[in-house]
Design a protein with these regions (language model features):
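Post-Walker A alpha-helix
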Residues: 121-122
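Glycine-rich, often acidic-flanked micro-motifs
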Residues: 97-98, 102-113, 127-318
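N-terminal start-of-chain detector that recognizes signal peptides
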Residues: 32-37, 71-74, 80-83, 197-204, ...
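Conserved glycine(s) of the Walker
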Residues: 116-118
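A generic structural signal for short, solvent-exposed coil/turn residues
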Residues: 17-21, 42-44, 54-56, 93, ...
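Extreme N-terminal, non-catalytic leader segments
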Residues: 41-105
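Long, basic/Gly/Ser/Thr-rich N-terminal segments
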Residues: 1-65, 72, 298-318
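Intrinsically disordered, low-complexity boundary segments flanking structured domains
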Residues: 11-18, 38-40, 47-49, 88, ...
Length: 318
């Protein structure tokens, strides 16, 4: 099981044999929870409910259900990630709803809400040979010690890809083959979201290692952020384009994408942030070159080159 978690966690977290350090949280499967534990559950849209028992006194979290290796592995990874992200939040690390890509070697944070086109854009950039994904949907950011630069770090989270994105980038036949090969257990139930109308485009979950194999690429674990792009999908090609975001607008747009909690679920480990460090990161981000970029979904591969070209104009010394 540890080997399975290691594969899912790479390249963001490492798994090593040995006893946990005193006072650290443990995530346990295959053992009976002791008396006095508190029930905790995670219910994500389109997924089976994952049940835990939590021993707060001894800092232990026990996986209870569902059974089966794939769900146990996913459950252990999710809980481990939540523990680390809560610790990072306490240290003042800032979490944004954003993707992070190295576009022609330059770290670009792509900010946007759900279905803003972040994952499609990053995948298209990789296929174009110009991009390396660090993360596709949520990034943690930390200001450098001098307060000027910012480093973005990814986390081991499955990559949610629209089914029409797979069709667009790979063709319907290969997209069907890709979907049938995916191992995230929630893929067995996610189609219910499209059938119910909750997710009209449909979605599939790829683990990072599956993404790397599919795209024949490496995944970066962290990179310096050199530009911020507020990304959105245009309703028609005529609406596509890129404009700079002025200083007076930057704070408000950035604040819309700040995650108030470090995790979608399992915020039970303490996460009150260091306000000074978090504010330094916000200030550093507001000083970065910032743009709003709208693109037409069907033209995503062409639009990758468009954004890369406009950024190159802004950084002529490169």
């Amino acid at each position: 099981m540890a080997e399975s978690v290691r594969r899912l966690a790479a390249p963001y977290l490492t798994v090593e044999p040995g006893a946990p350090a005193p006072g650290t949280w443990e995530v346990i499967a295959g053992a009976t929870p002791p008396a006095g534990c508190v029930a905790e559950s995670v219910t994500a849209q389109g997924e089976s409910t994952v049940e835990y028992m939590v021993d707060h006194h001894h800092r232990a979290l026990f996986h209870v259900a569902p059974e089966g290796d794939s769900w146990v592995t996913q459950s252990l990874l999710r809980a481990t990630r939540a523990i680390h992200r809560s610790a990072a939040n306490r240290q003042g690390v800032l979490f944004l709803h954003a993707g992070l890509v190295e576009l022609n070697g330059r770290g670009v944070a792509l900010l946007g809400g759900s279905r803003a086109g972040k994952t499609s854009f990053i995948m298209a950039s990789v296929l174009n040979g110009s991009g390396t994904m660090v993360c596709n949907d949520d990034v943690s950011l930390t200001a450098d010690r001098d307060g000027d630069g910012v480093t973005g770090t990814g986390w081991p989270r499955s990559i949610s890809v629209r089914l029409d994105t797979l069709d667009l980038l790979f063709g319907r036949g290969r997209a069907d083959t890709i979907r049938s090969s995916l191992t995230h257990p929630a893929n067995q139930t996610l189609l219910s979201l499209r059938e119910s109308g909750v997710e009209p485009h449909g979605t599939a979950l790829l683990y990072p290692w599956e993404y790397a194999d599919l795209m024949n690429t490496r995944i970066g674990s962290a990179t310096k952020v050199e530009a911020i792009v507020h990304l959105s999908l245009a309703d028609s090609p005529s609406e596509a384009g890129m404009v700079p975001v002025t200083g007076s607008q930057r704070a408000a747009l950035l604040d819309k994408r700040v995650l108030r909690l470090p995790n979608k679920h399992l915020n039970i480990f303490g996460h009150e942030p260091d306000p000074d460090r978090s504010q330094r990161t916000r200030s550093a981000l507001q000083n970065l070159p910032t743009f709003a970029f709208r693109y037409a979904f069907r033209d995503v591969r062409k639009e990758v080159d468009h954004l890369a070209g406009r950024l190159a104009e802004h950084f002529p010394s490169d």
